[in-house]
């Protein structure tokens, strides 16, 4: 089996650092959030441990031409900017545009989880969905809410695949792979004044 080389890079936004994994074309395969660079590196190694036969990871600086990867990283940083930096730019915010400009590829997850992640891509900035909404959109039985929740928790492409926009029917913020405090901060940034109406703390 041919082993594909992917490149990792650490970037720093206004509320967190992010570990990104991309290919030479700028396609994003992985994005993890955190405050500690060493912890992000350790998580990267752990998350890719089961993928060693398919992928090898190298630092981005080893890529001779990383112009496309740099562009993707720049677009990702737009997703990490404070609200006032992006909320007013015509019909679409910089945040929304940034997400649309980032090509992604799923290499983790089950078939169902990938279907859930694909559905999450349909949630616009400034809106939230309940787990039940995702179940209904995918035509799954109502009992699948837990599976949808697990899929959100298994997402390994932070922000671009917006699992942070899925909340409980009560409006309560439930688990988030990168911490509830981070989920809260992102939603406050995206929802603005609507946060207190849509989210119950």
UniProtKB/Swiss-Prot annotation:
CDD domains: ATase (cd06445). It holds the Pfam family DNA_binding_1. GO terms for biological process: DNA alkylation repair; methylation. GO terms for cellular component: nucleus. Signal peptide: none annotated. DNA binds at residues 131-132, 146. GO terms for molecular function: DNA binding; methylated-DNA-[protein]-cysteine S-methyltransferase activity. It catalyses: a 6-O-methyl-2'-deoxyguanosine in DNA + L-cysteinyl-[protein] = S-methyl-L-cysteinyl-[protein] + a 2'-deoxyguanosine in DNA; a 4-O-methyl-thymidine in DNA + L-cysteinyl-[protein] = a thymidine in DNA + S-methyl-L-cysteinyl-[protein]. It comes from the Eukaryota. The active site is at 163 (nucleophile). Its EC number is 2.1.1.63. Keywords: DNA damage, DNA repair, DNA-binding, Methyltransferase, Nucleus, Transferase. It is found in: Nucleus. Belongs to the MGMT family. Involved in the cellular defense against the biological effects of O6-methylguanine (O6-MeG) and O4-methylthymine (O4-MeT) in DNA. Repairs the methylated nucleobase in DNA by stoichiometrically transferring the methyl group to a cysteine residue in the enzyme. This is a suicide reaction: the enzyme is irreversibly inactivated. This enzyme catalyzes only one turnover and therefore is not strictly catalytic. According to one definition, an enzyme is a biocatalyst that acts repeatedly and over many reaction cycles. This is Methylated-DNA--protein-cysteine methyltransferase. It comes from Lodderomyces elongisporus (strain ATCC 11503 / CBS 2605 / JCM 1781 / NBRC 1676 / NRRL YB-4239). The gene is MGT1.
């Amino acid at each position: 089996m041919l082993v594909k080389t992917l490149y990792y890079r650490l970037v720093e936004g206004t509320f967190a650092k992010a570990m990104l994994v991309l290919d030479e074309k700028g396609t994003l395969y992985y994005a993890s959030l955190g405050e500690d660079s060493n912890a992000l590196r350790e998580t990267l190694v752990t998350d890719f441990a089961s993928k060693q036969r398919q992928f090898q990871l190298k630092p981005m600086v080893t890529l001779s031409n990383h112009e496309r990867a740099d562009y993707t990283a720049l677009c990702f940083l737009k997703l990490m900017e404070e609200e006032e930096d992006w909320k007013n730019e015509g019909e679409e915010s910089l945040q929304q545009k940034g997400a649309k400009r980032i090509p992604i590829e799923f290499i983790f997850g089950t078939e169902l989880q990938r279907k859930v992640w694909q559905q999450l891509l349909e949630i616009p900035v400034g809106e939230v969905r309940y787990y039940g909404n995702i179940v209904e959109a995918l035509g799954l039985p109502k009992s699948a809410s837990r599976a949808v929740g697990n899929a959100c928790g298994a997402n390994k492409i932070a922000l671009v695949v917006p699992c942070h926009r899925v909340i409980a029917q009560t409006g309560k913020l439930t688990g988030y792979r990168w911490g509830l405090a981070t989920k809260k901060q992102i939603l406050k940034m995206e929802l603005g004044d609507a946060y207190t109406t849509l989210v119950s703390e």
